[in-house]
Amino acid sequence: MTDKAGDWQEHGPQVEEAPPQVKRPPLFKVIILNDDYTPMDFVVEVLQKFFHMDRARATQVMLHVHTRGEGVCGVFSRDVAETKVNQVNDWSRQHEHPLMCTLKEA
């Protein structure tokens, strides 16, 4: 019995280290919302400028938004998604359009 107690005192407790459990950060969808006033060409321009879509893809997303009320522009980390939402909303206001983006957890 003294051997075991002596071992513990000399070498400390025997502990196995578990590998760290790192979670991926949550992703967020940037959602563009339809309105009755923003011209379709402006929406296409926004999708090309801020989401780097080619004209065909931007037109496809714009038509989806027009018919369904909203559409996904992309999926990003929270910081990037928030930045893109702010950029689109600011750009729209500067050009006097009510176009808005929001984000939802993916």
UniProtKB/Swiss-Prot annotation:
| Alphabetical list of Pfam families matching this protein | ClpS
Segments for region (Disordered): 1-21
- What segments bear the compositional bias annotation Basic and acidic residues? 1-14
Q: Which Gene3D superfamilies match?
A: 3.30.1390.10
Report the superkingdom from the record: Bacteria
Please name the InterPro entries in this protein's record.
ClpS, ClpS_core, Ribosomal_bL12_C/ClpS-like
* Gene Ontology annotations of biological process type: protein catabolic process; proteolysis
Q: Which family does it belong to?
A: Belongs to the ClpS family.
Q: What is the stated purpose of this protein?
A: Involved in the modulation of the specificity of the ClpAP-mediated ATP-dependent protein degradation.
Stored NCBIfam families: PRK00033.1-2, PRK00033.1-5
Subunit notes for this chain?
A: Binds to the N-terminal domain of the chaperone ClpA.
Query: What is this protein identified as?
Result: ATP-dependent Clp protease adapter protein ClpS
Q: Which organism is it from?
A: Alkalilimnicola ehrlichii (strain ATCC BAA-1101 / DSM 17681 / MLHE-1)
